[in-house]
């Protein structure tokens, strides 16, 4: 399964009913929609999947619904970040038991660990399971903890299961180059809403793992790049850059993403669980204007 961990992995939000319950039909519809977009796989229960707001039972429900809808030949990566090593191991084992192709793990933020502590944490998780661990390097989500290039390279050298990186430490293209130079065997995914996807590819990334609500656009960029049509990839990227930038605004990116999926008829409501940053009518009007200008209103194809 590790050979399939490349290309575009769309990170999906967790759909809720208006009363806050998991919306099973929307989870299935979102999975079908994402697969139909042509992505290489999906990632669930990440930061914008509101994983921290779910109970253990709800995590299992989302995993079961997604993995069943995806089918056995479509890889699902599951976020299993936890503040403690034992907790992360338990979540990762559970994801493997339920059929996950890989897990995604960010640094445990409460302990403010150094490189040695992070090495021990990740090795313990990797040794406890038989599937790849995507190391998430995203300082804003973990209290500012930054992973050094040496640590990342060392993780990949220690075991092939840790030779996967979701790099979101800005400026990401520069760090892609640095990690590639330190350990060329590491498979690097970009993130950050896709904002630097083209540049990350230029610097050696193998794809992107992010939640942009028009995954078919990221797929088109990636396929053009993979075919050798670098100008074509750039043309697509620069056309849709305004939307990528708009959707990935700090604090409101979750709300915007859910509103877009709702407008596209993929999820029944844009409901997020409290606490979250809502968007106002003016921002939604800006979104509608942008979608109209890019011919991306509901029912249209990118």
Roles of regions detected by a PLM:
Residues 1-4, 300-302:
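Short, low-complexity, intrinsically disordered N-terminal peptides in bacterial proteins
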Residues 9-14, 37, 202-205, 213-302:
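C-terminal alpha-helical cap/extension of soluble enzyme domains
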Residues 139-249:
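Catalytic alpha/beta core domains of metabolic enzymes, predominantly
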Residues 2-146, 154, 261:
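Active-site beta->alpha loop and helix N-cap motifs at the rims of alpha/beta catalytic domains
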Residues 27, 59, 63, 88, ...:
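A general structural signal for well-ordered alpha-helical segments in protein cores
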Residues 24, 28-31, 149, 284-291:
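Short, amphipathic alpha-helical "lid/cap" segments that border enzyme active or binding sites
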């Amino acid at each position: 399964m590790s050979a399939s961990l490349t290309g575009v992995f769309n990170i999906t939000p967790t759909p809720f009913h208006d009363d806050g319950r998991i919306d099973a039909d929307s989870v299935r519809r979102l999975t079908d929609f994402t697969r139909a977009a042509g992505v290489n796989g999906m990632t669930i229960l990440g930061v914008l999947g509101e994983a921290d707001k779910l109970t253990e039972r709800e995590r299992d429900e989302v995993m079961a619904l997604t993995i069943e809808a995806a089918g056995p030949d479509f890889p699902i990566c599951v976020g299993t970040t936890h503040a403690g090593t034992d907790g992360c191991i338990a979540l990762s084992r559970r994801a493997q038991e339920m059929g996950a192709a890989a897990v995604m793990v960010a640094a445990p933020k409460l302990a403010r660990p150094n490189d040695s502590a992070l090495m021990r944490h990740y090795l313990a998780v990797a040794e406890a399971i038989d599937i790849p661990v995507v190391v998430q390097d995203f300082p804003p989500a973990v209290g500012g903890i930054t992973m050094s290039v040496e640590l990342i390279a060392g993780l990949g050298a220690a075991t092939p299961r840790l030779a996967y990186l979701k790099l979101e430490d800005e400026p990401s293209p520069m760090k892609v180059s640095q990690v590639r130079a330190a350990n060329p065997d590491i498979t690097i995914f970009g993130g950050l809403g896709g904002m630097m996807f083209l540049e990350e590819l230029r610097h050696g990334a193998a794809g992107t793992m992010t939640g942009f609500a028009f995954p078919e656009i990221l797929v088109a960029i990636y396929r053009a790049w993979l075919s050798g049509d670098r100008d074509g990839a750039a043309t697509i990227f620069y056309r849709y850059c305004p939307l990528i930038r708009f959707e990935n605004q700090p604090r409101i990116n979750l709300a915007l993403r859910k509103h877009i999926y709702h407008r596209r008829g993929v999820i029944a409501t844009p409901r997020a669980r409290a606490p979250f940053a809502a968007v106002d009518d003016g921002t939604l009007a800006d979104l509608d204007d942008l979608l109209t200008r890019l011919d991306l209103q509901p029912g249209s194809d990118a």
